């Protein structure tokens, strides 16, 4: 059983939802980003989604777009992201780490080289938001052959005809995008999440986590109650932006505030027991 499976199994045994937290590699700088990763784990996150900075993150809202730009401005690269992943794995043997982002940086880096390094440093899976199942041969199938999970996104517009196609090669879990549009904006209603999860579960036995638009412990708890877990990203990234000094320098409050917020999120998903 891999780390992702173990994370969901632990959550089920404890009668709670699984908490995923997204942060961008190298935001606001590499040293602080490493400390943020540790704070997220300490706060109670079950799964880390580690964003690979990209200059044109089309599915992301203003918060994560700004996060990527801060990281890139600080000199973050895909190679440095992989080195951060390796250092994270050396510090945290059991927490699943998923690389999330867009295909362009991977293509430029070299897909096979990327997969070899990601596997070697202890990455557990990939979420590549702009690679549809029609392009599985580009990365999905080679990733799975390398031992990496390939997590698929399902949206509110994914109908009964499309779902089996999207989920045919999915592994690890399914990420339900609860809103149409970009990250960090409006939130979805409970009825729509419940209906979507029912449709997804009719096609796959994989766990389903809900993300996009989840900004509070209460919303995370509700999403975890309706699915198998919740992912929070923009609200965490906002803490970085809101605590930077005017000149862009960092301070200890960023790490402390993120740890506290993730702790509250963990309490939220624990409070919504089924």
Task: Mark where each language-model region is.
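Active-site-adjacent beta->alpha loops and helix N-cap segments on the catalytic face
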Residues: 1-11, 30, 55-66, 76-86, ...
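Active-site mouth loops of central-metabolism enzymes
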Residues: 19-35, 98-110, 149-158, 186
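Alpha/beta catalytic cores of nucleotide-metabolism and tRNA/nucleoside-modifying enzymes
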Residues: 198-204, 215-225, 229-274
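Catalytic cores of alpha/beta
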Residues: 30-41, 158-168, 210, 214-230
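Alpha-helix-loop-beta-strand connector modules within alpha/beta enzyme cores
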Residues: 62-98, 141-151, 155, 192-208, ...
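Hydrophobic faces of well-ordered beta-strands that scaffold small-molecule active sites
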Residues: 19-23, 48-50, 97-101, 126-128, ...
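Active-site/ligand-binding-proximal alpha/beta "capping" segment
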Residues: 116, 175-180, 184-229
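Glycine-rich phosphate-binding active-site loops on the catalytic face of alpha/beta enzymes
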Residues: 45-55, 125-127, 176-184, 213, ...
């Amino acid at each position: 059983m891999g780390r992702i499976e173990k994370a969901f199994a632990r959550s089920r045994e404890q009668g709670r939802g699984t908490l995923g937290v997204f942060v961008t590699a190298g935001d606001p700088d590499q040293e602080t980003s490493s400390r943020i990763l540790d704070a997220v784990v300490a706060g109670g996150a079950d799964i880390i989604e580690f964003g690979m900075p990209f200059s044109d993150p089309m599915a992301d809202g203003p918060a994560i777009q700004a996060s990527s730009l801060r990281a890139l401005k600080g000199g973050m690269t895909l190679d440095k992201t992989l080195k951060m992943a390796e250092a994270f794995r050396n510090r945290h043997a059991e927490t699943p780490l998923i690389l999330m982002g867009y295909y362009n940086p991977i293509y430029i880096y070299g897909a096979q080289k990327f997969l070899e390094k990601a596997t070697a440093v202890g990455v557990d899976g990939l979420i590549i938001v702009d690679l549809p199942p029609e392009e599985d041969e580009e990365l999905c199938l080679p990733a799975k052959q390398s031992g990496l999970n390939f997590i698929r996104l399902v949206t509110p517009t994914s109908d009964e005809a499309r779902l089996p196609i999207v989920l045919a090669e999915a592994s690890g879990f399914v990420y339900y995008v609860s809103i149409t549009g970009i990250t960090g904006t409006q939130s979805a209603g409970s009825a729509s999440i419940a209906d979507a999860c029912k449709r997804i579960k009719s096609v796959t036995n994989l766990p389903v986590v809900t993300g996009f638009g989840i900004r509070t412990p209460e919303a995370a708890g509700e999403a975890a109650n309706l699915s198998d877990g919740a992912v929070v990203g923009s609200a965490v990234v906002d803490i970085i932006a809101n605590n930077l000094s005017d000149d862009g320098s960092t301070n200890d409050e960023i790490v402390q505030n993120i740890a506290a917020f993730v702790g509250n999120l963990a309490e939220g998903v624990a409070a919504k027991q089924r």
